[in-house]
């Protein structure tokens, strides 16, 4: 525990947060007491495998997003990686751009002396961003789509030493079109490995590739993530080109769980046991320490007749963290760790992933069947048919077909029970807490891989009434 306390101690110079005089209506995503401690903008890094997504995040934030043993060994991202970074701008108007922009880790002070020779200015904190590092492997497409659900903007990475587009590049671009992401920066990475003429050629390829897509007209920035070349230019673009997304702090708080874990070590004394921790992205509202919360669908059970019952979990927030920064309240943006009093066995090994956490009695319904209006891609992305330059055609949805459905941060199986025109009914393998108007992504199994085939919007469905135990809140 001492190390954790020491790490929190590093934050002496961060702005203090005080719950007693918190006025939510006056909060903005750029309030000093908010951006001092937590990120308020989510930026996804997307692109083909091994094009340098995680390296770019490390160059900006200093954080290695590849954390798990099997990821490190294979040098690929499997789970969603998160890293927060503070972006500063020198307050001396004579400090030339782009050197007047710099980035550092989330736990650093809000003001730093300018590093340029003979500059008397100070770097002031202007943005606090969270990078959602998505996997580029086609097999991990579901994880990528879960990431797309929480992004405000995207960095599309294209390696300079390979032809453009690579299969996952086009698949990811389709995914961010589904999620209606408008803010995109294109990074031409590994520029140190190629000649200038190659870089110009590839620049033409990239502009041609993004024509007619959501990324058309997006700035293309040449960088080298390994050598940290042009990272200051990227910081300048993030500040000037990506607007701060509008947030509704007065809405009921809602967090989609992307990770959950049990922080207790084996052999821990019963008196020292800590409750489970849920990590996720807040979509709306403000979560506060001491607040009573509900997690839906909660504990899902099936009886011998196949009937599903859901028991929402009730608890209280005991702590909030953004990386190593302790919070009194958390707003949308970045990955927030929520320490609760939930039985840790319910949280261990990502058991709560795909669930929704929020204020008691203010969460949406739990759906077992969804009625959607859907749109299919014309061709499969990243799958070539023999002798054909274009992708394989996407077949229509068949009755009783099994698809992979992505709703928020949940990936679950779904069986098509009926289809007519562009409408379909899907019976889900696991119930989901969602609402009408939400977007979902549909993937089909092709050649042993789940491939994105289209998306849909929920307009109805069959809900489950949750079972509430007699003692509603476990305090």
Curated annotation (Swiss-Prot):
Enzyme category, top tier: hydrolase
Primary site of residence: cytoplasm
G4: annotated span: 189-192
Residues that, per the record, bind GTP: 50-55, 189-192, 224-226
Alphabetized PROSITE patterns for the sequence: G_TR_2
Molecular function, one GO term: methionyl-initiator methionine tRNA binding
Region annotation Interacts with CDC123: where it falls in the sequence: 456-468
One Gene Ontology cellular component: cytosol
Region spans: G1: 47-54
CDD domains given in the database record: eIF2_gamma, eIF2_gamma_II, eIF2_gamma_III
Region (G2): 75-79
Domain tr-type G: 38-247
Keywords: Cytoplasm, GTP-binding, Hydrolase, Initiation factor, Nucleotide-binding, Protein biosynthesis
GO biological process, alphabetically ordered: cytoplasmic translational initiation; formation of translation preinitiation complex
EC number, as in UniProt: 3.6.5.3
G5, as annotated region: 224-226
NCBIfam families in UniProt: PRK04000.1
Function of the protein: As a subunit of eukaryotic initiation factor 2 eIF2, involved in the early steps of protein synthesis. In the presence of GTP, eIF-2 forms a ternary complex with initiator tRNA Met-tRNAi and then recruits the 40S ribosomal complex and initiation factors eIF-1, eIF-1A and eIF-3 to form the 43S pre-initiation complex (43S PIC), a step that determines the rate of protein translation. The 43S PIC binds to mRNA and scans downstream to the initiation codon, where it forms a 48S initiation complex by codon-anticodon base pairing.
Similarity comment: family membership: Belongs to the TRAFAC class translation factor GTPase superfamily. Classic translation factor GTPase family. EIF2G subfamily.
Subunit field text: Eukaryotic translation initiation factor 2 eIF2 is a heterotrimeric complex composed of an alpha, a beta and a gamma subunit. The factors eIF-1, eIF-2, eIF-3, TIF5/eIF-5 and methionyl-tRNAi form a multifactor complex (MFC) that may bind to the 40S ribosome.
Protein name: Eukaryotic translation initiation factor 2 subunit 3
Organism: Drosophila melanogaster (Fruit fly)
Higher taxonomy: Eukaryota, Metazoa, Ecdysozoa, Arthropoda, Hexapoda
């Amino acid at each position: 525990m001492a190390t954790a306390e020491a790490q929190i101690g590093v934050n002496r110079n961060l702005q203090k947060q005080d719950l007693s005089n918190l006025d939510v209506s006056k909060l903005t995503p750029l309030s000093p007491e908010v951006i001092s401690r937590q990120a308020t903008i989510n930026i996804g890094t997307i692109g083909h495998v091994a094009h340098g997504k995680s390296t770019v995040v490390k160059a900006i934030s200093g954080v290695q997003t590849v954390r798990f043993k099997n990821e490190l060994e294979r040098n690929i991202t499997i789970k969603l990686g998160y890293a927060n970074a503070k972006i500063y701008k020198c307050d001396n108007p004579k400090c030339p751009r782009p050197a007047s922009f710099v980035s550092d880790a989330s736990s650093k002070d809000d003001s730093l002396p300018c590093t340029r020779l003979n500059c008397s200015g100070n770097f002031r904190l202007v943005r606090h961003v969270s990078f959602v590092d998505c996997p580029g492997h086609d097999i991990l497409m579901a994880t990528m789509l879960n990431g797309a659900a929480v992004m405000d903007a995207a960095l599309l990475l294209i390696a300079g030493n390979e032809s453009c587009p690579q299969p996952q590049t086009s698949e990811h671009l389709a995914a961010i079109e589904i999620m209606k992401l408008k803010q995109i920066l294109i990074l031409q990475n590994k520029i140190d490995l190629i000649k200038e003429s190659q870089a110009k050629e590839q620049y033409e390829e990239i502009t041609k590739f993004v024509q007619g897509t959501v990324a058309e007209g997006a700035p293309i920035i040449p960088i080298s993530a390994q050598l940290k070349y042009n990272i200051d230019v990227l910081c300048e673009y993030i500040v000037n080109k990506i607007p701060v997304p509008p947030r509704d702090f007065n809405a009921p708080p809602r967090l989609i769980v992307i990770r959950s874990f049990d922080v207790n070590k084996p052999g821990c004394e019963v008196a020292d046991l800590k409750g489970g921790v849920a990590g996720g992205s807040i979509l709306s509202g403000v979560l506060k320490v001491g607040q009573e919360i509900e997690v839906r669908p909660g504990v899902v059970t099936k009886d011998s007749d196949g009937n599903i019952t859901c028991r929402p979990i009730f608890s209280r927030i005991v702590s909030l963290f953004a990386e190593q920064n302790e919070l009194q309240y958390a707003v949308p943006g970045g990955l927030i760790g929520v320490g609760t009093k939930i039985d840790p066995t319910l949280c261990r090994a990502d058991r709560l992933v795909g669930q929704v956490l929020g204020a008691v009695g203010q969460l949406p319904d739990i759906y077992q069947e969804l009625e959607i209006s859907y749109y299919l891609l014309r061709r499969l992305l990243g799958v070539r048919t023999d002798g054909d330059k274009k992708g394989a055609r996407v077949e229509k949805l068949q009755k009783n077909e099994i698809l992979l459905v992505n709703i928020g941060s949940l990936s679950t199986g779904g069986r098509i029970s009926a289809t007519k025109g562009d409408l379909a009914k899907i019976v889900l393998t696991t119930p989901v807490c969602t609402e009408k108007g939400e977007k979902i992504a549909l993937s089909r199994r092709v050649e042993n891989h789940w491939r994105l085939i289209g998306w849909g919007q929920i307009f109805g469905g069959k809900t489950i009434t949750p079972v509430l135990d007699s003692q509603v809140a476990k305090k």
